[in-house]
C-alpha cells in the first residue's frame, strides 16, 4: 500500500521596510523552493523606497500587502492574519532560503507522529554582497538531545527566527507578535510557543542570514533596555520545573544564565539572576533544616530534637 505523503500548505511571509536593496533575492529564493505547496506573502511596512515597485513586478506569483509603518512585528502579524497555510515560515527581506528549506522540514514532519512540532536548524551568515562568512551550527556545541529540549535553545540564544517552521495553530492558541516590541518581538513570542510546544532540531543549514550596515541604525541604549526587560521577564516567568528540565537543577540554571547575561552586558538581568540564585540557596538551606527537624522528631522525640536544635544554634553563632 502506498503511504500518504504529508504535504500541507506552507505560508512564507516576507516583511519589508525599505528593503529594495535585498528583497528581490529573498523573494527569488522563496519562489525557487523545491517544495511547491507554498504561498508567498510580501508585507510592505510603509516603505519609502522602491519596495512596492519590486514587489508588484512579481505579479500573481506572490501575494502583496501594503500597510502603514508599524514595525516588523506588526508586518508579520499582517501576514499571519492573511495567510492560509498550515505552517508559517518567516523570511526577512534581506535573508535567503536554501532551495530545499521548506521541503527538508516537511520531510522531517513526515517522519514524526506529532505534526504540531516546531522545526528549526542552523544558518549561514553572509555579507552585504552575499559572500559566505561562516555557518552557525548549534549541534557543534550541544547534543541533539539538549537541542530538542523546549526552551533550551531559546535561552542559549541559538534560535534564528527564519529557520523555524511553525504550526499555524500556535498563533491561534497563543497569539501574535507583540507590536509594542521593536527588537525582541520574536524571542518574546518564541518563549510563549516553546513553553507549550515540542521542538525538533535538524542539523542541516537551510537559510542565509545577511549582515549589513543598515542593521546598525538602531540606538544601542533602546535595544539594551528592551533586551533587559526580555531576559528579566524570562527569569520571572520560568518555573522551577522548567529550570530543572533545562539544566538539571534550579541553582545550575541560574548560575549558568547569570554568566551568560553578564557576558552579553545585560547587567540588570544578571543581578536578578544572582538574587534569585541566593534565594534558592537560602530557601534550600531552610528546607533542609525543617526536614532534619521533622526527621529528628519522628525518630528521637521532642527532647532530643530540642537538644539538637540548641547545638545547631550554638554552632551557627561560632
UniProtKB/Swiss-Prot annotation:
The enzyme's E.C. designation: 2.4.-.-
Any one GO molecular-function label of the UniProt entry: hexosyltransferase activity
GO terms classed as biological process: biosynthetic process
Transmembrane segments annotated in the record for this chain: none
Keyword hit for Glycosyltransferase: yes
Keywords recorded for this protein, A-Z: Glycosyltransferase, Transferase
InterPro entries tied to this protein: Glyco_trans_2-like, Nucleotide-diphossugar_trans
Family: Belongs to the glycosyltransferase 2 family.
Record PANTHER family: GLYCOSYLTRANSFERASE, UDP-GLCNAC:BETAGAL BETA-1,3-N-ACETYLGLUCOSAMINYLTRANSFERASE-LIKE PROTEIN 1
Protein name per UniProt: Uncharacterized glycosyltransferase RP339
Protein species of origin: Rickettsia prowazekii (strain Madrid E)
Amino acid at each position: 500500500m502506498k503511504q500518504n505523503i504529508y504535504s500541507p500548505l506552507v505560508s512564507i511571509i516576507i516583511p519589508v521596510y525599505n528593503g529594495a536593496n535585498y528583497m528581490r533575492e529573498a523573494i527569488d529564493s522563496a519562489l525557487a523552493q523545491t517544495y511547491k505547496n507554498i504561498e508567498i506573502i510580501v508585507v510592505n511596512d510603509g516603505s519609502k523606497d522602491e519596495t512596492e515597485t519590486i514587489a508588484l513586478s512579481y505579479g500573481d506569483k506572490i501575494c502583496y500587502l501594503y500597510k502603514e509603518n508599524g514595525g516588523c512585528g506588526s508586518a508579520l502579524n499582517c501576514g499571519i492574519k492573511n495567510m492560509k497555510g498550515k505552517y508559517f515560515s518567516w523570511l526577512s527581506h534581506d535573508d535567503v532560503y536554501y532551495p530545499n528549506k521548506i521541503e527538508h522540514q516537511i520531510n522531517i514532519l513526515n517522519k514524526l507522529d506529532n505534526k504540531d512540532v516546531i522545526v528549526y536548524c542552523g544558518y549561514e551568515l553572509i555579507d552585504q554582497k552575499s559572500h559566505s562568512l561562516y555557518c552557525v551550527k548549534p549541534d557543534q556545541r550541544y547534543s541533539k538531545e539538549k537541542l530538542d529540549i523546549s526552551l533550551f535553545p531559546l535561552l542559549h540564544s541559538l534560535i534564528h527566527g527564519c529557520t523555524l517552521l511553525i504550526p499555524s495553530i500556535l498563533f491561534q492558541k497563543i497569539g501574535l507578535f507583540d507590536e509594542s516590541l521593536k527588537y525582541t518581538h520574536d524571542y518574546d513570542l518564541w518563549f510563549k510557543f516553546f513553553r507549550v510546544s515540542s521542538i525538533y532540531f535538524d542539523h542541516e543549514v537551510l537559510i542565509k542570514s545577511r549582515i549589513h550596515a543598515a542593521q546598525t541604525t538602531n540606538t544601542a541604549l533602546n535595544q539594551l533596555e528592551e533586551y533587559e526587560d526580555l531576559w528579566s521577564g524570562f527569569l520571572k516567568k520560568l518555573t522551577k520545573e522548567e529550570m530543572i528540565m533545562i539544566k538539571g537543577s534550579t541553582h545550575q540554571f541560574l548560575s549558568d544564565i547569570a554568566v551568560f547575561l553578564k557576558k552579553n552586558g545585560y547587567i540588570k538581568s544578571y543581578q536578578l539572576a544572582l538574587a534569585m540564585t541566593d534565594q534558592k540557596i537560602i530557601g534550600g538551606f531552610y528546607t533542609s533544616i525543617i526536614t532534619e527537624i521533622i526527621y529528628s522528631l519522628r525518630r528521637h522525640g521532642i527532647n532530643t530534637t530540642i537538644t539538637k536544635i540548641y547545638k545547631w544554634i550554638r554552632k551557627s553563632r561560632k
